[in-house]
Each structure stands twice: as structure tokens, then as C-alpha cells.
């Protein structure tokens, strides 16, 4: 997060994260995953997810989502947050704040005995009450020995559906929120996913553990 500032390239951020992950004795999960060429996904402005780090220079007013996966001791953690690059618009800041808060609204229902869709219902209800859209084309997921495991965890839908959560489950909860329409488009590189209307998007994610009480957050995205 501290590296998100005007004049920095997305590739420089990726390199710093790569070196940090290795310094902790972990492996960057994304690197080579499905052929992905980097250790992080860095998604700027209208890019929602899966932005490929490169020579793009960040500028004042950009919003920048950094998504990171690391594998250590056989377990994979997946997390993301969206950061302001310098001074951003009030509406862009609201989008970032609502996206992060929607994660916390969702995990109020990430408890033993509740159903998976209770999380997404809470996320969608909160996000839409704030005037934003929730991406449907991509969802959260189970996480553990592999990065993507069952069950899928949508950020939308009716409550009371899907498997019941049980103690010991590990889930990646990741609201992807748009300023306008929730429709998306994947670019020719087959990775970069943008809002169809070109408006801003934000992403926030942590991996959590279902316990017999409140869920435990396993990844900490503050400052990433």
C-alpha cells in the first residue's frame, strides 16, 4: 500500500511484493497459476481484477487494487485491498470505503450453521444501499491447500442457500464493487477484467476461518 503513489509502475509494486513473499519463506501463489505472469494482480481504476503488472505509471487520482496470494507451510492465503494514489475524488474514496466495509458486513454471517449465501446477501444489500453495484461474474471461494477450492462464495443473491458453514472451513471473501453497472468485460490478454461501462471498481479480500464464534481473519490487508 505504501508503494501506491504517483510515478511508480505496477511492475515495481509486483517486484516488491514478490521479494517480500520470498523473504518470509513463502511462495507467490499467483506466479504461473493458469499461466499468470506475475506475483500480484494490480488493477487500476476501471480494472476490477486480474490486472497484469507492467510499465503502467500510476498517477495522482488513480485507485489501485493489489491482490496477493502466498503459500506457506502447505496453506494458501489470498487477500486484496484497493488503495488511493495521492489525492482521489470523494466518490472514488467512498467506493473504496464501501467495498472494504461490505467485507465486514458479509462476515457477520460467516458463522457455523449459517449458509454460504447469507454472506453474499449481506454484501449485496449493503453495497446497493450505498448506490454501488456488485460484480456477478466472479466470486469468492474456499481456500486452503489450493488457492481455489469449493465452495464458491458469491457476493450477491438470496439468503439461506448453499452449504452450511462448519467450524474449520477456510474461505476467501472478496467483494468486487463497481461505481456503475456490474457488467464486466475481459480484455484480449484473457486476464484483465474491466467494468463494461468504464467506471471505477474496487476490490477487498481476506481469507477467513469459520470457528464456533466470530470468524477469524487469517490475512491482514492493512497496508498489505
What is each PLM-predicted segment?
Residues 1-224:
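Active-site neighborhoods and metal-handling regions in enzymes and metal-associated proteins
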Amino acid at each position: 500500500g505504501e508503494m501506491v503513489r504517483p510515478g511508480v509502475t505496477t511492475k515495481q509494486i509486483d517486484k516488491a511484493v514478490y521479494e517480500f513473499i520470498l523473504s518470509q519463506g513463502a511462495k507467490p501463489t499467483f506466479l504461473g497459476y493458469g499461466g499468470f505472469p506475475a506475483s500480484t494482480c494490480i488493477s487500476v481504476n476501471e480494472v476490477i481484477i486480474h490486472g497484469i503488472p507492467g510499465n503502467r505509471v500510476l498517477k495522482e487520482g488513480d485507485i489501485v487494487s493489489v491482490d496477493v496470494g502466498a503459500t506457506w507451510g502447505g496453506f494458501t492465503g489470498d487477500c486484496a485491498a484497493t488503495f488511493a494514489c495521492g489525492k482521489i475524488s470523494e466518490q472514488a474514496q467512498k467506493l473504496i470505503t464501501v467495498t472494504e466495509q461490505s467485507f465486514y458486513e458479509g462476515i457477520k454471517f460467516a458463522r457455523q450453521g449459517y449458509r454460504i449465501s447469507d454472506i453474499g446477501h449481506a454484501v449485496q444489500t449493503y453495497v446497493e444501499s450505498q448506490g454501488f453495484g456488485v460484480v456477478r461474474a466472479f466470486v469468492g471461494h474456499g481456500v486452503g491447500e489450493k488457492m481455489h477450492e469449493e465452495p464458491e462464495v458469491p457476493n450477491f443473491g438470496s439468503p439461506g442457500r448453499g452449504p452450511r458453514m462448519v467450524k474449520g472451513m477456510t474461505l476467501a471473501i472478496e467483494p468486487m464493487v463497481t461505481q456503475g453497472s456490474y457488467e464486466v468485460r475481459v480484455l484480449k490478454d484473457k486476464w484483465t477484467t474491466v467494468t463494461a461501462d468504464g467506471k471505477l471498481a474496487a476490490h477487498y479480500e481476506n481469507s477467513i476461518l469459520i470457528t464456533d464464534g466470530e470468524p477469524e481473519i487469517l490475512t491482514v490487508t492493512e497496508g498489505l
